[in-house]
Amino acid sequence: MSSSSSVRISLSFIFLALLISPAVSQTCKSQTFSGDKTYPHCLDLPQLKAFLHYSYDASNTTLAVVFSAPPAKPGGWIAWAINPKATGMVGSQTLVAYKDPGNGVAVVKTLNISSYSSLIPSKLAFDVWDMKAEEAARDGGSLRIFARVKVPADLVAKGKVNQVWQVGPELGPGGMIGRHAFDSANLASMSSLDLKGDNSGGTISGGDEVNAKIKNRNIHGILNAVSWGILFPIGAIIARYMRVFDSADPAWFYLHVSCQFSAYVIGVAGWATGLKLGNESEGIRFSAHRNIGIALFTLATIQMFAMLLRPKKDHKYRFYWNIYHHGVGYAILTLGIINVFKGLNILKPQDTYKTAYIAVIAVLGGIALLLEAITWVVVLKRKSNNSMKPLRT
């Protein structure tokens, strides 16, 4: 083998080593701090590429922490908190770090989060000191929060605290921090922290409550996608096109009613899970998605009850009832599909789910276009045959 080939191979191995080493090094045990500070316990937190180093002094119930994470975007923020009463963000006693827009220096502030609308600097419910923030350039632009916290007596007795962490893309006006994303990773960024370090060096889970909330979000999405986004369009296609064929009467009507009633029942279940999620997520509002959901439930409920008032075919009001029924039906069809896409944008599942739903809608749309052409041919041919019939004297 020539010397030039050997050099190229050696350089290739060096290049691969340089690529691999940063990925391998991103663990809590490999991190170092200024002043050679060390902490006996560290955790690779399961969400948001975050790490926690800590020590607990039982003699004075003091918890010393270093929280490290990359902001969601350059110029964003990171936060670590203890929630004395619950597991979510509301009620959290929070430390927030970001780079001051004026001078670019990392700073740390405290937030007592009573609601999602009160994200402004405020005093915590317990003492905290030695607060400092710094940028860790070697860790891909991560920020670090240093602090010592006086752990409340009731939490000391439990031996554990509920910790919450978060990252956001930007700062808001008036000293407020900007809104963070509501992806699964953001919603699952909470866990129980053992003060004695029994979970030291491990990766910890977000807890059953978080997993249940994510499961409910997925159930809500599936129920509503199937009902408003698939079954209702199928029912509309059945009503519009099958009725043209005399041989399909009255089967098309019962198929239409069965499909729409099933969609309504499933949709109500999805709507109820949405209400439950809203009640469990105080301060989190997706107004457009919520309002469309309420409108869908209202229109669909009216549509169901209107079936009880359906006039007979020869009744003088049947024409007006048909206009109402078709108008409300198409409104439900349109709003349902729009809201499914809004829900997908909120849930942010894997691209395959959104692609699959787009494929389903495309197939239904293609079937509708094909049936539209076929039924027009049938109707025009029927009219032509009727016009050619001789008049009886």
Curated annotation (Swiss-Prot):
Q: Mainly resides where?
A: membrane
Its needed co-factors are: heme b
The leader peptide range reads 1-25
Which residues does the UniProt record annotate as the domain DOMON?
48-168
Enumerate the residues binding heme b 2. Answer: H256, H325
Q: Which residues form a coiled coil?
A: none
Q: Where in the cell?
A: Membrane
Can you give the residue ranges of the Cytochrome b561 domain?
A: 184-380
- Cofactor binding, note field: Binds 2 heme b groups non-covalently.
Where does the chain cross the membrane? Answer: 219-239, 251-271, 291-311, 327-347, 360-380
Summarize where heme b 1 binds, as residue positions. Answer: H220, H289
Record-linked Gene3D superfamilies: 1.20.120.1770
Q: Which Pfam families match?
A: Cytochrom_B561 (PF03188), DUF568 (PF04526)
One Gene Ontology molecular-function label: metal ion binding
Q: Which CDD domains match?
A: Cyt_b561_FRRS1_like, DOMON_CIL1_like
- Provide the alphabetized UniProt keywords: Electron transport, Heme, Iron, Membrane, Metal-binding, Signal, Transmembrane, Transmembrane helix, Transport
Show the InterPro entries listed in the entry.
AIR12_DOMON, Cyt_b561/ferric_Rdtase_TM, DOMON_domain, UCP037471
Entry GO CC = plasma membrane; plasmodesma
- Output the superkingdom of the source species: Eukaryota
Membrane topology value: Multi-pass membrane protein
Functional description taken from the UniProt entry: May act as a catecholamine-responsive trans-membrane electron transporter.
Q: What is known of its domains?
A: DOMON domain could bind catecholamines and thereby could regulate the cytochrome b561 domain function. DOMON domain could bind one heme b.
Could you identify this protein by its name? Cytochrome b561 and DOMON domain-containing protein At3g25290
Which species is this record about? Arabidopsis thaliana
